[in-house]
């Protein structure tokens, strides 16, 4: 099924966990779904999230496959094989945390961990029909997570229920606690373009739930996407550019990395300004609403 990159048995807790193979586990190589890293040294210490899991009644049973170098949203891995989408075998699993999402859809673990820079937890969760969460940036430790330097990447869980997502978050972030709220949450829908089938499905659900939500606009939405991609491209080239010389990277990721090499520091600085404007808009909306609904797959 190409879901599992490597099996293991670490810890003896009651919760079974699989983690994306871009997270260090002591004594194992972190290959990030790429043949170009097959000869890398084994990790000398556990990533901080692994330490947290082992301190909270968990057993780590496997590393999961991913879109090569976590640089893609389809989950297709031309180097090591693409994880099958258990619920929809004819469709892509989504990426980059494809194996982590597919493992949950196949009921191979209680929860799994992935990483999300520009949708890499949210996309595969949507594609595989499971729950996935990208926490607030900086909330969950990235120590021991690859690439080492990222200004957008987050570690986040996948599970088959919201309750298990909450449990996973309590394990990987000691400060996390489920919010208690007596009143109904104030929600709004972000106005983004989407396929009519997606729009109709959401409206159908809201109607059945007897919910009428306001629609809100974000002026910097499209420019924020472009800015995010510039930052991601620049940082991935810094992290993995040297690997393009090995001849061992799949054609799709090789092409994306070589294109990313053209991203300049001037572009990144401008992108950071857009990021700040976008963050300001979102923060203002979250002063009024508890959550904003946005389609993951449009």
Model-flagged regions — what are they?
Residues 46, 54-169:
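Short glycine/serine-rich loop segments
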Residues 1-42, 46-47, 52, 67-72:
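Short, well-ordered alpha-helical
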Residues 14-32, 230-274:
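Short helix-loop capping/hinge segments that flank enzyme active sites or metal/cofactor-binding pockets
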Residues 297:
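Conserved small/polar residues in nucleotide/adenosyl-binding loops
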Residues 199-216, 241-247, 268-289:
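Acyltransferase
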Residues 170-230, 262:
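Gly/Ser-rich, acidic/histidine-flanked active-site/gating loops
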Residues 37-41, 153-160, 260-263:
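Short, well-ordered beta-strand elements within core beta-sheets of diverse protein domains
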């Amino acid at each position: 099924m190409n879901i599992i990159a490597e099996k293991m048995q670490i810890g003896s807790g009651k919760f079974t966990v699989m983690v994306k193979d871009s997270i260090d586990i002591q004594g194992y190589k972190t290959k990030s779904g790429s043949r170009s890293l097959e000869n890398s040294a084994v990790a000398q210490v556990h990533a901080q999230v692994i330490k947290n899991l082992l301190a909270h009644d968990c057993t780590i049973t496997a590393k999961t496959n991913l879109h090569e170098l976590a640089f893609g949203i389809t989950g297709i891995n031309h180097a090591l094989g693409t994880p099958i989408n258990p619920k929809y075998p004819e469709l892509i699993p989504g990426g980059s945390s494809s194996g982590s999402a597919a493992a949950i859809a196949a009921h191979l673990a209680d929860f799994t961990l992935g990483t999300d820079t520009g949708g890499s937890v949210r996309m595969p969760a949507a594609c595989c029909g499971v729950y996935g969460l990208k926490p607030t940036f900086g909330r969950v430790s990235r120590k021991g997570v690859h690439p080492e330097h990222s200004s957008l990447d987050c570690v986040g869980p996948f599970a088959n229920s919201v309750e298990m997502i909450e449990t996973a978050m309590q394990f990987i972030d000691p400060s996390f606690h489920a919010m208690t709220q007596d009143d109904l949450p104030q929600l709004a829908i972000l106005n983004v373009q989407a396929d009519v089938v997606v729009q109709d499905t959401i409206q159908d659900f809201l109607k059945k739930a007897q919910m009428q939500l306001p629609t809100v606009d974000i002026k910097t939405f499209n420019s924020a996407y472009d800015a995010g991609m510039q930052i991601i491209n620049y940082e991935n080239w810094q992290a993995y550019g040297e690997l393009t010389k090995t001849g061992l990277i799949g054609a799709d990721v090789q092409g994306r990395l070589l294109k990313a090499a053209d991203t300049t520091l001037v572009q990144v600085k401008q992108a950071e300004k857009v990021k700040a404007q976008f963050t300001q808009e979102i923060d203002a909306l979250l002063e009024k609403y508890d959550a904003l609904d946005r389609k993951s797959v449009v």
